[in-house]
A protein has these predicted regions:
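Short amphipathic alpha-helical segments
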Residues: 15-42
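Glycine-rich beta-strand-turn "strand-cap" elements at beta-sheet edges
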Residues: 41-55, 81-112
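Short, well-ordered beta-strand segments in beta-rich or mixed alpha/beta enzyme
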Residues: 3-11, 41-78
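Generic alpha-helical structural signal
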Residues: 21-25, 70, 83
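Residue-level signal for secondary-structure boundary sites
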Residues: 15-17, 67-69, 108
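A common structural junction motif
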Residues: 27-29, 77-85
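Short, surface-exposed, polar/charged, turn-prone segments marking secondary-structure boundaries
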Residues: 33-38, 59, 66-72, 86-91, ...
Length: 112
């Protein structure tokens, strides 16, 4: 069972898709290395196919529980190496497009 933090976002116009994903991966890899996240997945819209106006990239970050997610947020601020790659990634994001969602596996332990 996991909590899944999902972000939809586009990169800024002057940034390539590859640079966007490379910078994002540096940050997310740091969270995994520091045991603050289980894993992640980055996907890109295929052929522009979608039923609503969502940004092009989807980032799914999987956490054991809400405490691990909270710990990931804290290390982003407190660890200089993690903060550096976080800032490096954030400057590539088109902030007008970013959307955040929090999902969980269902049914979870509370629903069984």
């Amino acid at each position: 069972m996991a909590d899944i933090y999902t972000i939809y976002a586009d990169h800024k116009d002057n940034i390539s898709a590859k640079d966007f994903v490379d910078k994002m991966s540096l940050f997310l890899d740091k969270l995994v290395e520091n045991k603050k996240m289980l894993n992640y997945r980055i996907t890109r819209m295929k052929l522009g196919f979608r039923s609503m106006d969502l940004p092009e990239f989807r980032i799914d970050m999987e956490f054991e529980n809400m405490q691990q997610l909270d710990d990931a947020m804290k290390i982003t601020i407190s660890d200089k190496d993690v903060d550096k790659v976080h800032v490096g990634f954030n400057q590539y994001v088109d902030v007008d497009t970013i959307q955040h969602f929090l999902y969980r596996d269902y049914p979870d332990d509370q629903q069984k």
